[in-house]
Amino acid sequence: MDVLSVSEINAQIKALLEATFLQVRVQGEVSNLTIHKVSGHAYFSLKDSQSVIRCVLFKGNANRLKFALKEGQEVVVFGGISAYVPRGDYQINCFEIEPKNIGSLTLALEQLKEKLRLKGYFDKANKLPKPHFPKRVAVITSQNSAAWADMKKIASKRWPMCELVCINALMQGEGCVQSVVESIAYADSFHGTKNAFDAIVVARGGGSMEDLYPFNDEKIADALHLAKTFSMSAIGHESDFLLSDLVADLRASTPSNAMEILLPSSDEWLQRLDGFNLKLHRSFKILLHQKKAHLEHLEASLKRLSFENKHHLNALKLEKLKIALENKTLEFLRFKKTLLEKISTQTLTSPFLQTKTERLNRLENALKLAHANLKLPQFGAFVSKNNQAIELEALKRGDKIELSNEKARASAEILSVDRV
């Protein structure tokens, strides 16, 4: 038996291992995972309960990995055994890696969902409300697709007042993600302008999971989440549930269903308006009847108040007349009282006057007798001043006197008085 050097035995082992284990599938738990930022290579160990083997995933293969490799994952690696002669080490050079029991796409999608959930992409608080009566809707789809034709037909039937604008985009295959992302951004760029869209609908009909899978892409999710315009995802059929359905403000099972959800039914609203009109008419009649009854009540009250007001005014006038009458009565009574007092005074003093009158009559008779017995010279006369006899010696210039005898009476004014 030949004696081999360390290098020789390691080289033979390398050749044997690489030839024998050219392609292998090995399952185990990922541990000691290290991803070099510069090179992009990933180094880790694959272990089970009894053993460990080192693995390497070079950058080219790592970029094709559909999910994020994490510590503790149960995976199945596909690759070949390679040996490093200087150290006598061997490892699995991984070409592909899949999660154990589930596909890599499924795991990748679950990982992405968790990432977006933590960022709040699915929170209801971040969802925009559906517009009640859309006037302008952007539909991101293929302009030659059956989905677009169905959507136009349903929209024209349900709500013909709405303007449906097709933004043509690739809806499957290579370039689909970028085309949809750009279309969403374009439609949303009108936000806040007079040509703004009330809603953006991303729509395509059914297809294979491979055809629909682009709508699980993170870039489309980002575009929908960042849009300021209300968005809807209408991809595939009822059974197809994609990431875009979770991120959009509202999900529709099909493109046709999107139009049924988004647009109100003109027929239903016409029926509602008829119902509103009937209710309004009934309410108006009831209100009119109530107001009429109230008006009649007010009119009756007004008449009653008018009569009462007139009665009150008449009562005031009567009261004033009563007061005036009382005042006049009192004034008349006071006048009569005064007059009565005067009459009473005169009545009380009438015997005195009668006595004086009788005396005066006696004096007058005596005077007449005196005149009759008095012998006056011919053409003589009595002289009096102020109805009183006065001697000539007492007269003075300017006195007014009266001259009288049995036959006549005369008035005179003294011009001068000469003493004898």
Swiss-Prot record:
Swiss-Prot/TrEMBL keywords: Cytoplasm, Exonuclease, Hydrolase, Nuclease
GO molecular function terms noted in the UniProt entry: exodeoxyribonuclease VII activity; nucleic acid binding
Subcellular location: Cytoplasm
Keyword Methyltransferase on entry: no
Gene3D superfamilies in the cross-refs: 2.40.50.1010
Annotated GO biological process: DNA catabolic process
Keyword Metal-binding: no
Pfam families to which the protein is assigned, alphabetical: Exonuc_VII_L, tRNA_anti_2
A GO cellular component entry from the record: cytoplasm
Catalytic activity: Exonucleolytic cleavage in either 5'- to 3'- or 3'- to 5'-direction to yield nucleoside 5'-phosphates
Top-rank taxon: Bacteria
Enzyme nomenclature, EC number: 3.1.11.6
Main localisation: cytoplasm
Cross-referenced HAMAP family: Exonuc_7_L
Similarity section: Belongs to the XseA family.
Record note on quaternary structure: Heterooligomer composed of large and small subunits.
Functional summary from the UniProt entry: Bidirectionally degrades single-stranded DNA into large acid-insoluble oligonucleotides, which are then degraded further into small acid-soluble oligonucleotides.
The protein's name: Exodeoxyribonuclease 7 large subunit
Organism this protein belongs to: Helicobacter pylori (strain Shi470)
Source organism phylogeny: Bacteria, Pseudomonadati, Campylobacterota, Epsilonproteobacteria, Campylobacterales
Primary gene name: xseA
